[in-house]
């Protein structure tokens, strides 16, 4: 068991080192030259700071200062997609999921528009964007299913729906164990070529075409993604796992981390089911504390290269967070 835990930790840490290197081979197609950033700001104690204005922010792309074209304060409404994992792995705690989802919706502002998507063997839009809290609650209650995990298909549907929300600020909250069926099958087929210790380093989660397709679209639309990772996807909780199972589950969890990091969101890990409601409420608070900044890059070349983004606030004691960058294509 001690060896198993060490192996899992190695896989999780190792994959993090190679994320940006692999991204150099990936190209993002941005629909517009305008770059949109959702930006969170906290103080030294981690408390959200919501009283800033445009003059408090400075944006850099590849170290070059950029002119901010537009600025939206934290009170500006959001369009939020709530994605619920209704695959077979969540059958034992559906009521906990529903009650936790209610807490998330209750913590949003009345003007925020919410769409609800469920996924299992299928991906279903339970309700389109609405401010009608009763309709949203009915969708959460009705969410159901079993079978496979179509996580990335659900994310693709969510991004397509957000495309119709115009200039509204956009976010996705996705509850899942991260073990997408299609991605897992691809990983398994790939790992079958390796044996023994080779399995532990062969799989590079950041090279997944399924993942990078979602990252391309989310970057182009300025969408922030907040995964809530269920304990059923934790490689530490597998019973007597094989090296291949450990590798696949660790890759699935790392892909959730990449989704959050690349889009400026946060991966919240649910270690115990009773934590779910609190974490949902915390994510809602994070969303409500986001500013939105837009700029047009001074480097107009669409050469497919990675553009690193850095955003600073005028008070050096405050900490800002946004997406890491984009590929200029």
Label for each model-derived stretch:
Residues 5, 20-21:
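Residue-level detector of intrinsically disordered, flexible termini
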């Amino acid at each position: 068991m001690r060896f198993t835990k060490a192996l899992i930790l190695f896989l999780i840490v190792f994959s993090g080192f190679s994320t940006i290197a692999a991204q150099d081979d990936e190209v993002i197609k941005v629909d517009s030259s305008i770059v949109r950033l959702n930006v969170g700001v906290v103080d030294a104690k981690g408390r959200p700071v919501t009283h800033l204005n445009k003059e408090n922010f400075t944006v850099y792309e590849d170290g070059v200062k950029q002119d901010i074209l537009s600025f939206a304060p934290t009170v500006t409404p959001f369009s939020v997609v709530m994605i619920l994992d209704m695959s077979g792995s969540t059958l034992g705690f559906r009521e906990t999921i529903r009650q936790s989802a209610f807490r998330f919706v209750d913590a949003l502002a009345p003007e925020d528009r919410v769409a609800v998507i469920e996924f299992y063997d299928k991906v279903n839009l339970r309700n389109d964007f609405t401010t009608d809290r009763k309709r949203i609650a009915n969708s959460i209650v009705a969410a159901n299913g079993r079978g496979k995990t179509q996580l990335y298909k659900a994310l693709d549907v969510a991004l397509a729906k957000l495309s119709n929300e115009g200039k509204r600020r956009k976010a996705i909250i996705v509850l899942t164990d991260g073990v997408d069926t299609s991605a897992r099958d691809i990983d398994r087929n790939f790992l079958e070529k390796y044996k023994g210790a080779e399995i532990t380093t062969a799989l590079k989660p950041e090279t997944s075409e399924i993942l990078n397709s979602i990252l391309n679209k989310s970057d182009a639309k300025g969408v922030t993604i907040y995964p809530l990772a269920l304990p059923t996807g934790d490689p530490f909780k597998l019973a007597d796992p094989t090296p291949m199972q450990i590798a696949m589950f660790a890759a699935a969890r790392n892909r959730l981390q990449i989704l959050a990091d690349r889009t400026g969101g946060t991966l919240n890990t649910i270690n115990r089911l009773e934590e779910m409601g609190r974490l949902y409420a915390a994510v809602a608070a994070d969303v409500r504390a986001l500013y939105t900044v837009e700029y047009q890059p001074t480097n107009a070349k669409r050469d497919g290269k990675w553009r690193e983004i850095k955003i600073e606030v005028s008070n050096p004691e405050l900490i800002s967070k946004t997406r890491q960058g984009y590929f200029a294509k």
